């Protein structure tokens, strides 16, 4: 059985990225994305937790390894990496999730909104 993770509060997630930025660690793009999720109202229907440079989101609570969008921000290359799988791809020995995309930092919010429409979240 897959591990289940309790979501974090969106204000906590935003504060975590703000603290990283305040320390000069370069997470402005992730903070902007989180602020967009909150201001757009998507936070009312999405559950999430963060682990430094990765934000994991789902429309189910608690979060599992399936039906989770993992957004990683590559600070060095200024790329958003989106990974999504309807199933726990690691459980089935797949090398990567069924949806794996990289986007330039300036496209991250737009691509996030497109993903939500595509997956109907």
Where would I find each of the regions flagged by the language model?
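Mixed-charge, Lys/Arg-enriched low-complexity segments
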Residues: 1-15, 87-121
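Negatively charged, low-complexity tracts enriched in Asp/Glu with abundant Ser/Thr
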Residues: 1-63
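Compositionally biased, low-structure terminal segments
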Residues: 18, 74, 81-83, 113-116
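Generic N-terminal initiation segments characterized by hydrophobic and/or small/turn-forming residues
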Residues: 30, 43, 66, 109, ...
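Intrinsically disordered, low-complexity regulatory segments enriched in Ser/Thr/Pro
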Residues: 62-106
